[in-house]
Amino acid sequence: MYYGFDIGGTKIALGVFDSGRQLQWEKRVPTPRDSYDAFLDAVCELVAEADQRFGCKGSVGIGIPGMPETEDGTLYAANVPAASGKPLRADLSARLDRDVRLDNDANCFALSEAWDDEFTQYPLVMGLILGTGVGGGLIFNGKPITGKSYITGEFGHMRLPVDALTMMGLDFPLRRCGCGQHGCIENYLSGRGFAWLYQHYYHQPLPAPEIIALYDQGDEQARAHVERYLDLLAVCLGNILTIVDPDLVVIGGGLSNFPAITTQLADRLPRHLLPVARVPRIERARHGDAGGMRGAAFLHLTD
């Protein structure tokens, strides 16, 4: 059996998958925030419960936000303070007496989608998350591409390209990002960025779901906003595609539930690509909340 953990700032979610990659059982517990020992205990107790339930010693994979393993073997995960700065993989491997695999949660999302039966035909799969932030991962022949610093796929921290500023207006504000830089595309293309753009142009503070509801009702202002957002997304994604040239782009995160993102994006891309470039297939993520657990479990299938 394959155990996949999706660990975030508020919850530890475990999914158990069989050899056919089907989910057999899942459980969630709160993430301990202050004690590393309590954090390790929470993970180990879930593993012990799964071992007992299925009568086996399952493999363990973990997806977690941040850099899963720095050069000295420690984890950097600001959203999981109890474990950040600790040798998490080594400690869990020792306590569980088995090989523990660890990767960035966005890579696990992308891996989950790349291993979907419909998508395994594509050699290079790009996962793009449009949620609280903007991120993603790259999967080549079923394996994550991590890079030297584990930052492959940090698309949200690319800066707005010149074409975007020309389109939006040269007086368009370059917002300061949590990373310390200005103009990162995450501040405009995330769910929060989607709402910020609406407020910037129409001086009305509305959350993304309400804007989308207005769009569905035919509201002209909301429709103009969505057109502008999609144009901005196409400019930024065009830069990424020129570098990566994937066969498939799978979009996840809260904004992926908005059909216009996947149905109207492809037609906007060609003018932002080289003439010889082919627009990749663009699809909405298939596995929803289970994607992180699923991808983490499949880390043991990438050998």
Swiss-Prot record:
Pathways per UniProt: Cell wall biogenesis; peptidoglycan recycling
Domain of life of the source: Bacteria
Alphabetized UniProt keyword annotations: ATP-binding, Carbohydrate metabolism, Kinase, Metal-binding, Nucleotide-binding, Transferase, Zinc
Pfam families: ROK (PF00480)
E.C. designation(s): 2.7.1.59
Family matches, as NCBIfam families: PRK13310.1
Family: Belongs to the ROK (NagC/XylR) family. NagK subfamily.
UniProt name for this protein: N-acetyl-D-glucosamine kinase
Taxonomy of the source species: Bacteria, Pseudomonadati, Pseudomonadota, Gammaproteobacteria, Enterobacterales
